Amino acid sequence: MAMKNLLSLARRSQRRLFLTQATRSSSSFSAIDSVPASASPTALSPPPPHLMPYDHAAEIIKNKIKKLENPDKRFLKYASPHPILASHNHILSAPETRVTTLPNGLRVATESNLSAKTATVGVWIDAGSRFESDETNGTAHFLEHMIFKGTDRRTVRALEEEIEDIGGHLNAYTSREQTTYYAKVLDSNVNQALDVLADILQNSKFEEQRINRERDVILREMQEVEGQTDEVVLDHLHATAFQYTPLGRTILGPAQNVKSITREDLQNYIKTHYTASRMVIAAAGAVKHEEVVEQVKKLFTKLSSDPTTTSQLVANEPASFTGSEVRMIDDDLPLAQFAVAFEGASWTDPDSVALMVMQTMLGSWNKNVGGGKHVGSDLTQRVAINEIAESIMAFNTNYKDTGLFGVYAVAKADCLDDLSYAIMYEVTKLAYRVSDADVTRARNQLKSSLLLHMDGTSPIAEDIGRQLLTYGRRIPTAELFARIDAVDASTVKRVANKYIYDKDIAISAIGPIQDLPDYNKFRRRTYWNRY
């Protein structure tokens, strides 16, 4: 009986095996039948081999490199790291920035938020210390002071009282490439603020006694700036990095120029640089675009029409980066301060966004703020744990045709060697050891920082004015975030290899810096032996 059962099981197994083979054979026949008649059995190619994981990774890398080497030309003008489009829905849902260009070339740009109770209106001018000569260096800053010293319609006192009576705030600042005059007022005083701005920019009197009085004020300001070592370090950094070029000049200018600037110099600077085509009227908050445009048409009627553009001026005197250093030993200072920088990207360079992410990856840290030792940045974590600095800050400065990317640090004299090694180690590491987690963290921190910075009408107006002067348009937040999200670890490595790895550096240092390594040691640490 047991033998019969075994034989029965054997027959069933053979029957199942036969049915399985028959099914497989019929599938093979079906596949052959589906081949076109013109193809002979011998023409059948063997099945392709399975794609190995490293082959798949190599294909992804090739596609990314292809995108990086052949970016969409539409984005080259606007600093996109590689072609990627933002969602149109997000862009359209953001507050609209409306721009109107008047016949004389003056641009009026607004972002309306009628629920706000305040507004900021200002004039952003494509003029700064970069567009001066050695003889006139300091004129732009001197003019910023003199512009509030009375017009044909308003005395100095009347101007100050008018702004105070409406609860407003009037201010100005000068940088290397831009000058700005702006007013923050209540929603009912926007037209009055525009009238004040138009008056001071077109009808300032520049009385000789006022000029002489302001000359002394600026000389005292220069003494105050010389006492701010961080300002001195960064001014010296520009002077050595861009030596013998316009970007190397200071904003305040040398003392001998301040002592010799005349009324004619101020008037000539306005005529040649405060031109309609180089100016943007920006407004944000409780403003209506049509009303602002009409007011600007009515008020800004005396602007110069000099055809010279900043692009022509930059082309005539381009910035040139020079690997070099400047050191000032001062043992009276309690701490040493220094900055080390590489040549960075311009505003419109496709790599500028990646450098912003890299700046965030390096981060900043201050011993007195209490940020903690276990922060996300490898550099700040190394500095904090080993206690080799009082503060440290990565910076990324953009200009029309170049930039500066580097680190500024404050430390005790006996920590300089360890600190300089840590800085160069972590900065150079960006060229070949970057994790996706670090890049993602930096992207999120950067986006958060940008959003927090845009809180208020004044930062929004400043953003509008600056972007129209640098990009020619206002970049929507959603589009900017899409560009930031397009930066990954491979992008960071590529950009770091382009701007950092084995590249010249500029160094500026002040204080008890005898133990700061020499230039050649810094330079050798811009590369590693990776073999």
Curated annotation (Swiss-Prot):
It is an enzyme of class 3 (hydrolase). Transmembrane segments: none annotated. GO terms for biological process: proteolysis. It is found in: Mitochondrion; Mitochondrion inner membrane. Pfam families: Peptidase_M16, Peptidase_M16_C. Binds 1 zinc ion per subunit. Residues 1-78 form a transit peptide. It is a peripheral membrane protein. One of its GO terms (cellular component) is mitochondrial matrix. Binding to the alpha subunit is required for catalytic activity. InterPro entries: Metalloenz_LuxS/M16 (IPR011249), MPP/UQCRC_Complex (IPR050361), Pept_M16_N (IPR011765), Pept_M16_Zn_BS (IPR001431), Peptidase_M16_C (IPR007863). The keyword Oxidoreductase applies. Zn(2+) binds at H141, H145, E221. Its EC number is 3.4.24.64. Belongs to the peptidase M16 family. Heterodimer of an alpha subunit and a beta subunit subunits, forming the mitochondrial processing protease (MPP) in which the alpha subunit is involved in substrate recognition and binding and the beta subunit is the catalytic subunit. Component of the ubiquinol-cytochrome c oxidoreductase (cytochrome b-c1 complex, complex III, CIII), a multisubunit enzyme composed of 10 subunits. Catalytic subunit of the essential mitochondrial processing protease (MPP), which cleaves the mitochondrial sequence off newly imported precursors proteins. Preferentially, cleaves after an arginine at position P2. This is Probable mitochondrial-processing peptidase subunit beta, mitochondrial. It comes from Arabidopsis thaliana (Mouse-ear cress).
